[in-house]
């Protein structure tokens, strides 16, 4: 047992105290808890006073996850995009940063085919605009798309508190905001990828925060916020937008408020139609739908026929298509549903499961039963799609938090000590893993990473192991002078993921990534880019192999 890497870290290290990294983390947790517990009454009193100051709480909750993530930059730099979804969303953000909805078709687009990217009739991402707007904001204002991701997570945490204020007492709303910061903040995949999640979560906060306020006061401001939330969801996840509309109706939102919200929603509809026209040439065809027609991906619902590609597929596109065919259909439907249970862990820290039974007695009131109905509609809406990720249900994020907070509130009537213990365990869980990542201990991170929850920060973004080799390749290309052209040659037995990752303006990009189509075809692209140094990348090698392109 003592040979295990984890136990070896508990042995004396090279420091005066004989502490290893885990020792320092444990000591820090102990100091924190010993300091907090005796002062619990004073802390609760201060929190109650703070909880009613909406603007201050929202500002603090917005800043908290961002500051915590920035503190990790020394060991976990700005996330490296790794998968086709990342590349497609970054393309969308870059397109919007150029103040256009689509890019002209490239004359040699056959070299630039990639998963989740359309080449004809326009060069574009297949995704809706919402997440792209956030990335474009980060790129334009901070020269870094990830800044938009971080800001969106901060906004989500602040708006979770605002939403909860309409449902529970201010102290519980503040607690919910803090839970959001540690669940969806610095260590979350939503903060450390470019796929999104926070933007749809913001939309859900606006909708589910406005609805109870409209039933109580019917203020025009809340109707406008409802419309903004629905519009943001339409621009981010159009299918779940329909679910949100149904939920709003089931909540018996006043007709006048729904009318105002519908008017506020019109610009989002207009933007969607305009994007459709710019990308697909049709006002009513989504880029998503065109990709499904052209490449057969993304797939259809389980009860629909498997889409048939109408264009030749690249190796990576074929792999993705075959994978989607394998999971499509009703044959393994129940197995897939069972496999989705683990994804709901994303919305609950493990100790919170102990409090959830306290929520059950509240279901006798429609106001609380409606929460379960709303979550059930989200579940049902996504149940027939072969794949599932937490961002599919991101709009319901605040509802999961609401269930947690109400459960803790009800449990506190039975046992305050139980609630205190659950919250201490939640805090200790977060602080332990945050301390592990903050320590920057390479061996510790590698040893403990299998024990961390699947949805956590990407340990390899810091280059500790860089299993895909992307960071090393990117760094090598960045060190070269002038413009570069990289031909990507996949091996017959693929192990790598998508490597074609071009910007909106391909011809003006410093690095152009192209599919290796053979010596004859490649010469055409080399002549098109006479001022670029050509490279050959073999990403399936271990490590990926980058060599000067052979001269003819």
Predicted ranges, named:
Residues 55-69, 180, 225-226, 230, ...:
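Transmembrane alpha-helix segments characteristic
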Residues 58-62, 160-184, 198-202, 216-225, ...:
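Transmembrane-helix signature of polytopic, membrane-embedded enzymes
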Residues 90, 190, 197, 236, ...:
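Hydrophobic/aromatic-rich transmembrane helices and adjacent perimembrane loops
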Residues 136-137, 163, 176-181, 205, ...:
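Membrane-interface alpha helices of multi-pass inner-membrane proteins
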